[in-house]
Amino acid sequence: MMGSWKHCLFSASLISALIFVFVYNTELWENKRFLRAALSNASLLAEACHQIFEGKVFYPTENALKTTLDEATCYEYMVRSHYVTETLSEEEAGFPLAYTVTIHKDFGTFERLFRAIYMPQNVYCVHLDQKATDAFKGAVKQLLSCFPNAFLASKKESVVYGGISRLQADLNCLEDLVASEVPWKYVINTCGQDFPLKTNREIVQYLKGFKGKNITPGVLPPDHAVGRTKYVHQELLNHKNSYVIKTTKLKTPPPHDMVIYFGTAYVALTRDFANFVLQDQLALDLLSWSKDTYSPDEHFWVTLNRIPGVPGSMPNASWTGNLRAIKWSDMEDRHGGCHGHYVHGICIYGNGDLKWLVNSPSLFANKFELNTYPLTVECLELRHRERTLNQSETAIQPSWYF
């Protein structure tokens, strides 16, 4: 009887061990097969990108650098989608960054941006437009649930193009980020149609060069921008569309005799400046005054950063700071034209814009649409990852390669 019991126990243990080995080897084989397929796709993509740089034309039918969010656990998603999961250098470890990302559509393009800028030492706040579809909201929430250093903004806005809600979305994230335990040095604001042209390490090195100064490119308002803050504007929001209208009512003068500047909505801010913006009465009064202006995110940051004595201020900075590469429709004589198409006067980049983009000194470029011009995004993505890994001081995991 005892011998029979021992025999059964041995048999059960052996079967369990065989099952474990089978499952382990099957998963290992699947991961290796996935990595081999990914490598093949990346190699084909690299050749296609090279041909594009040589002036050839491609019309791909599907994306090469696929992601697997719908059918994966978080671990599988991060491995199969090639996220970098370790800090790549001591320099980057000692200079963590914070990001705000405002999004309302096009999950695929956002996912590529997030994968490109993601590093475990950084922290990410995503503002999800209240008007976004339920499917989009669900996909974003599912993605962010896999990353302990990424989260949704605690306060949400229905964002209107050109309205105060766009600035408020960034401020909502900023409030969450200053409460974060991550000791970030600068916060960079982005939107879901941005893409980085520089690696995380290059961005860190660029920001360190400013020695604690905020980067808010801008000047005194040109003639075409004066009306933005001279007249009262109103946000209109309904179930069909949303927009800002200009009224004939004049605005009161700016608070505290502030000189209003005009600049870019894209900035890089120190933590001390972020706290100033959220707490100082000067900043709070400017925000209140700006609520009925047009596109206040293009005057709010730069106006505060031109005031002497404000933390990290640059009173005479002008357009200093290569934060964003943008092709405006009225500046084709400077950039040579858009090879995609224009929306709101801004180029949605196509394949023919790639050479211009990779030669840009800017940290990021805007705007992209993965579904419309997939190779434009993926050629930049492949180049960005190759350069990221080439700069690494950390042993590279096989899954980090595309």
UniProtKB/Swiss-Prot annotation:
All ranges on the Lumenal side of the membrane: 24-400
Mapped to this chain, the residue ranges on the Cytoplasmic side of the membrane are: 1-7
EC number(s): the record gives 2.4.1.150
Impact reported for R228Q: Defines the adult i phenotype
Glycosylation site list: N41
Kindly give the PANTHER family that the UniProt entry links to this protein.
GLYCOSYLTRANSFERASE 14 FAMILY MEMBER (PTHR19297), N-ACETYLLACTOSAMINIDE BETA-1,6-N-ACETYLGLUCOSAMINYL-TRANSFERASE (PTHR19297:SF190)
Quote the protein name from its UniProt record.
Answer: N-acetyllactosaminide beta-1,6-N-acetylglucosaminyl-transferase
Provenance organism:
Homo sapiens (Human)
